[in-house]
């Protein structure tokens, strides 16, 4: 039977760590706390990028914790929401790296996901206005399992690991089967230390070309 995200996620949901985590999150919701993203958006990355379509993984940390920002894709925000600083810096690098790239007026990265870019956060929920509030709830175990499945069952996937957190998360990726591109995080705190000029977007397309796979059209960032 072909592997699907549905079968992979269903197997994780049966495990004790996941059930314990769900109880913690449900308890917070029942106390009236705002948890982002909305429940129906937690697994958006998997909905938009089927397992066997994954070509690239861009690993984020935890969801944006402001109202209306997080919608289940790392670094992305819904149309109409102000572009966050890290994504703005990603756009700046794209404008330097990819000929003809025009910086969009929104931060909605759905079209990347639909082309095979898994926009995966390490932690998939957060409490409003409390960064990293759901770290250690169990999401790290879940996303380790996701990365392991890609590592074990796919070949030639390109992992973009920006910053120490992502690089540590990707430490067990088999580089004889996959590709890793590392740079500092695009955050304003670190982008000038080597994210700008890393050329990861063009390098990704070069690696895809060498595998006879279609390139990512990074410039196809539409707001619908």
Swiss-Prot record:
Keyword annotations from UniProtKB, A to Z: Cytoplasm, DNA damage, DNA repair, Hydrolase
Q: Where is the signal peptide?
A: none
Query: What is the uppermost EC class here?
Result: hydrolase
Report the InterPro entries cross-referenced here: UDG_fam1, Ura-DNA_Glyclase_AS, Uracil-DNA_glycosylase-like, Uracil-DNA_glycosylase-like_sf
Would you name any one GO CC term?
cytoplasm
What are the subcellular locations of this protein? Cytoplasm
Primary residence:
cytoplasm
Please state the Enzyme Commission number of this protein.
3.2.2.27
HAMAP family given for it? UDG (MF_00148)
To which protein family does this belong? Belongs to the uracil-DNA glycosylase (UDG) superfamily. UNG family.
Describe the task this protein carries out: Excises uracil residues from the DNA which can arise as a result of misincorporation of dUMP residues by DNA polymerase or due to deamination of cytosine.
Output the NCBIfam families linked to this UniProt entry: PRK05254.1-1, PRK05254.1-2, PRK05254.1-4, PRK05254.1-5, ung
Q: What is this protein called?
A: Uracil-DNA glycosylase
Organism for this UniProt entry: Aliivibrio fischeri (strain ATCC 700601 / ES114) (Vibrio fischeri)
Q: Which gene codes for it?
A: ung
């Amino acid at each position: 039977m072909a592997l699907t995200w549905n079968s992979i996620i269903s197997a994780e949901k049966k495990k004790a760590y996941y059930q314990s985590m769900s109880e913690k999150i449900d308890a917070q919701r029942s106390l009236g706390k705002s948890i982002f993203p909305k429940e129906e958006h937690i697994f958006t990355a998997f909905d938009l990028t089927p397992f066997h379509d994954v070509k690239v993984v861009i690993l984020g940390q935890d969801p944006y914790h402001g109202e209306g920002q997080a919608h289940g894709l790392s670094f992305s925000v819904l149309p109409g929401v102000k572009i966050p600083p890290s994504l703005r810096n990603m756009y700046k690098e794209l404008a330097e790296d990819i000929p003809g790239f025009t910086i969009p007026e929104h931060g909605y990265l759905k079209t990347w996901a639909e082309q095979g870019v898994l926009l995966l956060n390490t932690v998939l929920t957060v409490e409003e206005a409390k960064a990293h509030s759901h770290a250690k709830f169990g999401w790290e175990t879940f996303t380790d399992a996701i990365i392991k499945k890609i590592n074990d069952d796919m070949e030639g996937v390109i992992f973009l690991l920006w910053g120490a957190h992502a690089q540590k998360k990707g430490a067990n990726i088999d580089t004889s089967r996959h590709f890793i591109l590392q740079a500092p995080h695009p955050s304003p705190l670190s982008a000038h230390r080597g994210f700008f000029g890393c050329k990861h977007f063009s390098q990704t397309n070069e690696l895809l070309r060498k595998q006879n796979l279609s390139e990512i059209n990074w410039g196809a960032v539409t707001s619908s």
